[in-house]
Amino acid sequence: MGEKIKNLPEELRPRERLLRHGPESLNPAELLAVLLGSGTPQENALELALRLLTTFGGLKGLIEVHPEQLKSFKGIGQAKAAKLLAALELARRYYELTGENKLNFLNPDDVYNYLRYKIGHKKQEQVVVLYLNTKNQLCGENIVAIGGVNHAGVSPGDIFREAVKIGAYAVIIAHNHPSGDPTPSKEDIDFTGRVKKASEILGIKLLDHIILGENKYISMKAERLF
């Protein structure tokens, strides 16, 4: 049975150290322990945090973990899982907010850098549409499918419905490949071709279809695949 954190010397307690010296003084396990708040009868919060990080392969693995895996992890439960998921989502939204101040999508790198923290790590394919104004600035975005373009029933209508509603000038499609390989599949190419035809009919430009892999991406526009 692990020693309770409250019985540790004050200089070893993560919460007290955070308040006294700032969050940058804590390692990932200690920061995680502060979020957890408490442990189990068998282990304290710090030991539980270390087990979480070890099991899921560090911070990167923890960010990528499916919510159901987290909720079913021994010692976590619904309340602790909710705290962790909320903290991870706040971090993602921070990246969104800081990125939106600079978001003129002038090249594929801009799209990749914006979306890599949103969908690049997901274990399931997610199809995202970015809606742009005439200056190529973000005016909206939408996740139109989870599961991928080849088996989630995504249609060109799903891509352009919101674009028409908000008066978008152009759209960029993006989706991730959980395998880490961003090479477009035949389904990706066929789907993009259908969307391109619909864009010409509607008068809304399709600027690109970006496929995100593990720390890399492919621009279907740059590859002249549509």
UniProtKB/Swiss-Prot annotation:
Superkingdom assignment: Bacteria
MPN domain: residues covered: 104-226
Family matches, as InterPro entries: MPN (IPR037518), RadC_JAB (IPR025657), RuvA_2-like (IPR010994), UPF0758 (IPR001405), UPF0758_CS (IPR020891), UPF0758_N (IPR046778)
Pfam families (alphabetical): RadC, UPF0758_N
A GO molecular-function annotation: metal ion binding
Short sequence motif named JAMM motif, residue ranges: 175-188
GO biological process: proteolysis
SUPFAM superfamilies on file: JAB1/MPN domain (SSF102712), RuvA domain 2-like (SSF47781)
Residues annotated to bind Zn(2+): H175, H177, D188
Keywords of the record: Hydrolase, Metal-binding, Metalloprotease, Protease, Zinc
Family named by the database record: Belongs to the UPF0758 family.
Protein name: UPF0758 protein CHY_0341
Organism: Carboxydothermus hydrogenoformans (strain ATCC BAA-161 / DSM 6008 / Z-2901)
